[in-house]
A protein has these predicted regions:
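Short, acidic/polar
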Residues: 13-28, 76-93, 140-150, 219-226
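Active-site groove signature of glycoside hydrolases
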Residues: 89-110
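N-terminal binding-site loop/beta-alpha segment at the start of enzyme catalytic domains
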Residues: 1-64, 121, 127
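Structured C-terminal cap/extension of enzyme domains
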Residues: 26-29, 33-34, 53, 150-153, ...
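Structural preference for beta-strand elements that scaffold enzyme active sites
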Residues: 34-35, 63-69, 96-101, 130-135, ...
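Distinct, well-ordered alpha-helical segments
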Residues: 46-57, 78-89, 109-120, 140-153
Length: 259
């Protein structure tokens, strides 16, 4: 979710619309979906506390799965990681995270995580039961991901950018990155399936006309279903920010049929 806001812009800073978030959370859970994603830096920390108020305080812990992330901006050395992690648990109001990611890894950032023994620290937290599954989110070339997965076999899953527009973007290396995940048999979470909304509400008129003529759903539905149809993918983050978008997502993902 890109949380709805009372002030500021969606995806930026400001005051979160907690009433609207609660309605979206309830609708999402009522229809059998469970996965919620946050990070310490999202909305200057308000994303984590919104999860606490709208999700954790209002629903049984075993009714949802919650993801948080170790973001490089908030720690400098290994000794900083555990206090940051405990702060994240407190902000979210939970005693463990179902999923925890090394956030936005690039070649340069991976070297820092590796030299600072961040992987060892997060693995220790997992052994203590405070993390159920450890993964990474990734923003670099395929050869970098290959190196990371070879050197860190304890990684359980990988979050990557994957959408139908990026097939022509050599900077993203969409298919090569995906193929590395397949090579190492790592389940994939997709981020940016709608490329920041470009494949949802900002399509060129000609492309929008082609999709509308198919009468098979909204433009966003094609983008999200395209990502969800890939065999290695087990989760797609849709970035919905309104109740209407949540209802649209549910309409084609509740009884999902691959494209």
């Amino acid at each position: 979710m890109r949380l709805p806001m009372l002030t500021g812009e969606v995806g930026g800073s400001g005051e979160v619309d907690l009433e609207q978030v609660s309605k979206m959370v309830d609708l999402f859970l009522d229809n059998g979906f469970t996965y919620f994603d946050t990070a310490h830096g999202y909305i200057s920390g308000s994303s984590e506390t919104a999860m606490r108020e709208c999700l954790v305080k209002r629903h049984p812990r075993d009714s949802f799965t919650l993801t948080d992330k170790l973001t490089g901006n908030y720690w400098q050395k290994q000794e900083d990681i555990r206090p940051l992690f405990e702060k994240q648990l407190e902000a979210c109001g939970v005693t463990y995270f179902d999923y925890y990611l090394m956030h936005a890894l690039t070649n340069e950032l991976y070297d820092r995580y590796k030299s600072s023994h961040a992987f060892e620290e997060v693995l220790a937290l997992k052994k203590e039961g405070k993390i159920r599954h450890m993964g990474i989110s990734f923003h670099d070339k395929a050869y970098v991901l290959d190196r990371i997965l070879k050197e860190q076999p304890e990684i359980e899953y990988v979050q990557i950018q994957y959408n139908y527009r990026d097939i022509t973007d050599s900077g993203v290396e969409r298919d090569k990155v995906y193929d590395v995940c397949v090579k190492y048999n790592k389940p994939v979470i997709v981020m940016e399936p709608c490329k920041g909304g470009a494949l949802a509400d900002r399509l060129p008129d000609q492309a929008k006309g082609i999709l509308n003529a198919l009468h098979g759903g909204s433009p966003a539905s094609y983008a999200i279903r395209f990502a969800a149809s890939q065999p290695q993918v087990f989760m797609v983050l849709s970035g919905m920010s309104t109740l209407e978008q949540a209802q649209d997502n549910i309409s084609y993902m509740k009884d999902f049929k691959p494209l």
